[in-house]
A protein has these predicted regions:
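Intrinsically disordered, polybasic Lys/Arg-rich low-complexity tracts
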Residues: 433-477
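Flexible loop/turn segments at secondary-structure boundaries
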Residues: 13-15, 76-80, 110-112, 148-152, ...
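Generic structural signal for well-ordered alpha-helices
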Residues: 52-56, 88-92, 121-131, 154, ...
Length: 477
């Protein structure tokens, strides 16, 4: 029996305002609030909200027989909370159905997995906290920014406790193999890989309304027939796409919503099920290893990282940004931490691409700038001001060795505090047990005359105040 695995990406960056050279050192607010409000509100009204309503209607109609997964960046969630709070509520309704899974990713939709492993781990943890805070779900499957993946990343993902990762079924890593199987990482054998079926995904997200396409118009029954006609042993079809496919990239008038609504009915006729990524991982075995020595992604024709790191402008900007990572992680300034995340969004480097032809048109379509050079200049002006603010707290006179020593001290203190908190909790539990044991339950006299609670027996194990003092000292270090 075949299964379809749907995954939708939602991401919006905090776009930068026009930031001049003369603003450096004087203006510490970098964002175009009007553009951010207008863009996410428009997309939510055209796409996110009606698509959520569509999915909720489908789940009510088909129950557990229809399931999907989402990956929503932290920066998108923040903007949706500010500008379109009704989206968060509608997503909570979807989460409550039990038919929607939330995937993990980097909070800032960043390139940290390629540049800064410590930052990568920190962002993934922050993202998952945000998902649990809003939707009450703990992600167990990981998807990196723009499906960026290689063997080194798989090792980090497995170490964070994830059971699987989804990425692009790039032709140059597949060779003769099919994306319609579950694979595993050669360096993280417990981590299962789910590969995007690029053709079938792009048939919906990019070609659906293209009247010049040989298969136009695409109907639900035709599409399900394509999946059903795949070789019998190919049991899985991963359909990964941007959520804007519904209503934004493919307008409502194209029939995209009606197409989606009809899929479960025709799938059921062919015996095709819908699985979430975690269900795929639990129900399907890996058929073998899939080595990925160099990073891949789902962007551009090359399916590599050249969309963000393909020219000297991009490389210089990324290098400058991550050169201050350790210093930023030492900062306690909330605004600096926030700006650090917002400036890491991969979109800023995507706008700097100098590619031509079809790839170039995609980059220019999404960019708010006239040229890649304008994008670079504006970003570097902002980054220069940001670096000044960081250096005011941790000057360049403090070398990396001293910084590493500070980081080590902070980590040791954090571990010590965690250990002390565990000890305090154990002592508290022991005190509760001792107190409970002091009350005899079989004496009638206890019922006739109320008595004051006896104090807990003092024993060497119950020196709680001393533990508190130790905790305070550890905190002040």
């Amino acid at each position: 029996m075949k299964a379809i695995c749907f995954y939708f990406q939602i991401h919006q960056p905090f776009r930068l305002k026009n930031y001049r050279f003369f603003d450096i050192g004087n203006d510490h607010y970098y964002y175009d609030d009007f553009a951010n409000d207008e863009i996410i509100t428009r997309i939510a009204q055209r796409s996110y909200l009606p698509a959520n309503a569509m999915l909720l209607e489908m789940i009510k109609q088909y129950g557990k027989k229809f399931k999907v997964a989402f990956s929503i960046s932290g920066t998108a969630l923040e903007q949706l909370e500010i500008y379109v709070p009704e989206f968060i509520e509608s997503m909570k309704d979807l989460a409550d159905t039990g038919c929607v899974e939330f995937l993990s990713e980097t909070y800032a939709h960043s390139l940290a997995s390629l540049e800064d492993p410590d930052e990568f781990v920190a962002q993934v943890k922050d993202h998952d906290k945000k998902i649990f805070q809003l939707f009450g779900k703990h992600p167990v499957v990981f998807r990196n920014t723009e499906l960026i993946y290689d063997d080194d990343i798989s090792a980090m993902v497995q170490n964070m406790g994830f059971k699987g990762v989804i990425t692009e079924g790039a032709k140059h890593i597949l060779g003769w193999k099919s994306p319609n199987y579950v694979y595993s990482s050669p360096v993280a054998p417990k981590l299962k890989l789910l590969l995007k079926n690029s053709k079938l995904s792009d048939d919906i997200s990019f070609r659906f309304s293209n009247s010049d396409w040989a298969s136009y118009p695409l109907t639900a029954d035709k599409y399900i027939d394509w999946i059903a006609s795949l070789p019998e042993e190919e049991q899985l079809v991963n359909l990964f796409m941007n959520y804007e496919t519904f209503g934004e990239m493919q307008p409502r008038e194209s029939g995209i919503f009606e197409f989606m609504k009809a899929l479960p009915r025709f799938a059921a006729e062919k015996g095709i099920e819908f699985f979430t990524p975690s269900e795929v991982i639990s129900k399907m075995k890996s058929v073998g290893e899939m080595p990925v020595m160099h990073p891949i992604s789902w962007a551009d024709e090359a399916r590599d990282t050249s969309a963000w790191l393909g020219n000297t402008l991009q490389q210089e900007a990324v290098k400058k940004l991550y050169s201050i990572g350790e210093r930023v992680r030492l900062c306690q300034d909330r605004r600096i931490k926030q700006d650090w995340y917002y400036l890491q969004a991969s979109d800023h480097f995507f706008y700097m691409s100098t590619k031509h032809n079809e790839d170039g048109s995609v980059h220019s379509h999404y960019s708010p700038y006239d040229s890649p050079y304008t994008a670079f200049t504006n970003y570097m002006n902002v980054l220069s001001d940001f670096m000044i603010r960081v250096q005011e707290q941790y000057p360049e006179s403090i070398d990396n060795e001293e910084l590493n020593a500070l980081l080590l001290t902070i980590r040791n203190q954090s571990n010590e505090i965690s250990q002390l908190n565990r000890e305090v909790e154990m002592l508290r539990n022991n005190i509760v047990k001792d107190t409970t044991g002091d009350f005899p339950v079989d004496k009638p006299a206890a019922e006739e005359k109320p008595t004051k609670k006896a104090p807990a027996k003092k024993s060497p194990a119950a020196k709680k105040p001393a533990a508190k003092k130790t905790t305070k000292k550890a905190t002040k270090k």
